[in-house]
């Protein structure tokens, strides 16, 4: 891939993001580099720095905001996000179903929509910053305390009475929801998928983390946790969040049309310039404190009294001075003393890799190398489909067809692949069975075929029961329907809500067997498309007008509509 004349969006301008941008302007002439940071001050500083390095052909622009939030909340500071109504709005946003409107509300979608980058490089430490609760385990512990006080267990037959929802309970519940990284990361990746398809993003590279700098469960460092020693709950949560993100992106990598790469440094990423002065601990400035004379430590008194005595003995100055030390800033907004730096980068500990080396690996990956792409390595190491399994599949399907014929009962849907798959299989089966062959299904009058399909479902008791037994409704051409007592779609029914035409259309897309003429026409057009593609010799698909397999037909349809696994090299 050539980088000249490309628009490149870099999300995150910490050590790695900045180093990648510097390498880009040194090694190529992109049309535009967009730097997105979490804070406006950082954006202005990084863009100004890069403008001094970039050539005249490269435009440097910036944007800022919370990359995980809905766009209308992206510029809210963390203190503003502490507002109760804002936090509730965030929780509702992340936990609502991923409809198209929801996906287009996200900051990542808006960024790609606005700047139309050819390449996106995400260098944010997502595992550390994706949630909106400082201590998820404490928050969930508070929720657990509330759960213990609700009385007996809740069942469908006898729901337990929940306590009145006080503001405190609402806050604890909201905080617990915002501590869940999976919905937040899922919304981000799903919105990224939508944006990559809508705006033709050519490649996405994620720079991520092992969670422990390449160390294992024996890692002694808590990354600032003062409540635990060794591998803390906070660190385990970070590792889990990173794993969720990697798995989501790996599946996006297997999606047709999505070129996704993953680069992970497995060591402490280098450092900035050495300095002397105020420093931070756990992200906060360290205030100077002292206790110049010993105080008695009483075994029979609370520790809080001792702390109070210490503050009386050494009263704080009006302008509390900052503690100062020789230190060096490193990744994750951390600063390290000389001794800490020596320890953490020693052989056998985190060790270290320079930010320039990480940037070089990212650019190599961007240019097409797979040396540092973990997804390529995972694909290579994973066990793929085999010839033996294909032979056994053929034998198993033959046995199933023989049993179907012996019992004179079609085996179409069990419901275990979801209502939409079940709906598609049943519609195709009914359509082709009513027509008599694939050729007739493609060419018959749509109105006549809809009538024949409706008659088949009314007359074939076993087929009808197969649909209704798994919660599918059957929508007939004359505004009538067939339905059992339990419906899979919609999953929740409002007893007071009136059914609208829009509801029916929505439910029929999700999981109602739709035998109306418009849906029949949809399948006829797609069957013709399959026939044209197969006739062109582009596939090994056996197009037999009478001995067809409805599962194979639907698989072909999914392949043509982008709902198939990505084939390596394509």
UniProtKB/Swiss-Prot annotation:
The active site is at 306 (proton acceptor). The keyword NAD applies. Disruption phenotype: Cells laking this gene are unable to produce indolmycenate. GO terms for molecular function: oxidoreductase activity. GO terms for biological process: antibiotic biosynthetic process. It catalyses: (2S,3R)-2-hydroxy-3-(indol-3-yl)butanoate + NAD(+) = (R)-3-(indol-3-yl)-2-oxobutanoate + NADH + H(+). The keyword Oxidoreductase applies. Keywords: Antibiotic biosynthesis, NAD, Oxidoreductase. Coiled coil: none annotated. Its EC number is 1.1.1.397. Involved in the biosynthesis of the antibiotic indolmycin, an inhibitor of the bacterial tryptophan-tRNA synthetases. Catalyzes the NADH-dependent reduction of beta-methylindolepyruvate to yield indolmycenate. Belongs to the LDH/MDH superfamily. This is Beta-methylindole-3-pyruvate reductase. It comes from Streptomyces griseus. The gene is ind2.
């Amino acid at each position: 891939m050539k980088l000249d004349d490309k628009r490149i969006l870099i999300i995150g301008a910490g050590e790695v993001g900045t180093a990648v941008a510097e390498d880009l302007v040194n090694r190529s002439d992109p049309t535009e580099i967009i730097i997105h940071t979490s804070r406006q001050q950082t954006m202005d500083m990084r863009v100004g720095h890069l403008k001094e390095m970039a050539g005249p052909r490269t435009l440097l622009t910036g944007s800022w905001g919370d990359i995980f939030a809905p766009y209308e909340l992206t510029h809210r500071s963390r203190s503003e996000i502490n507002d109760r109504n804002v936090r509730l709005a965030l929780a509702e946003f992340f936990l609502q179903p991923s409809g198209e409107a929801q996906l287009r509300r996200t900051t990542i979608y808006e960024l790609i929509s606005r700047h139309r980058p050819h390449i996106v490089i995400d260098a944010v430490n997502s595992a550390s910053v994706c949630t909106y609760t400082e201590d998820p385990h404490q928050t969930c512990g508070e929720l657990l305390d509330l759960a213990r006080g609700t009385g007996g267990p809740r069942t469908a037959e006898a729901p337990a009475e929940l306590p009145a929802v006080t503001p405190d309970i609402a806050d604890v519940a909201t905080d617990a929801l915002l501590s869940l990284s999976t919905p937040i990361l899922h919304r981000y990746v799903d919105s990224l998928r939508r944006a990559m398809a809508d705006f033709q993003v050519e490649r996405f590279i994620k720079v991520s983390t092992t969670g422990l700098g390449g160390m294992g469960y024996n890692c002694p460092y808590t990354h600032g946790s003062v409540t635990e020693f060794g591998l803390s709950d906070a660190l385990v949560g970070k590792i889990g969040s990173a794993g969720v993100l990697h798995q989501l992106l790996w599946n996006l990598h297997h999606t047709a049309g999505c070129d996704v790469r993953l680069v992970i440094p497995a060591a402490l990423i280098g450092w900035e310039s050495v300095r002397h002065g105020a420093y931070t601990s756990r992200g906060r400035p360290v205030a100077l404190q002292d206790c110049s004379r010993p105080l008695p430590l009483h075994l029979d008194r609370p520790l809080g009294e001792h702390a109070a005595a210490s503050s009386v003995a050494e009263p704080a100055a009006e302008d509390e001075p900052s503690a100062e030390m020789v230190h060096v800033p490193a990744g994750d907004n951390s600063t390290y003393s000389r001794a800490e730096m020596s320890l953490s980068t020693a052989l056998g500990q985190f060790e270290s890799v320079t930010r320039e080396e990480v940037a070089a690996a990212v650019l190599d990956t961007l240019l097409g190398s797979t040396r540092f792409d973990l997804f390529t390595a995972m694909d290579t190491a994973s066990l793929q489909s085999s010839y033996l399994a294909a032979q056994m599949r053929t034998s198993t399907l033959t046995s199933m067809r023989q049993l179907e014929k012996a019992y004179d009962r079609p085996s179409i849907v069990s419901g275990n692949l979801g209502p939409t798959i079940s709906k598609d299989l049943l519609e195709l089966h009914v359509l082709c069975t009513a027509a008599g062959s694939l050729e007739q299904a493609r060419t018959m009058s749509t109105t006549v075929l809809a009538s024949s399909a409706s008659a088949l479902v009314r007359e074939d008791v076993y087929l009808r029961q197969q649909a209704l037994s798994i919660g599918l409704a059957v929508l007939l051409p004359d505004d009538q329907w067939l339905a059992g007592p339990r419906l899979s779609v919609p999953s929740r029914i409002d007893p007071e809500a009136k059914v609208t035409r829009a509801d029916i259309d929505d439910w029929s897309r999700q999981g109602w067997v739709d035998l109306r003429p418009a849906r029949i026409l949809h399948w006829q057009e797609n069957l013709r498309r399959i026939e044209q593609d197969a006739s062109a010799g582009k596939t090994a698909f056996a197009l037999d007008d009478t001995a067809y397999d409805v599962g194979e037909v639907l698989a072909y349809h999914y392949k043509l509509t982008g709902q198939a696994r990505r084939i390596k090299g394509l």
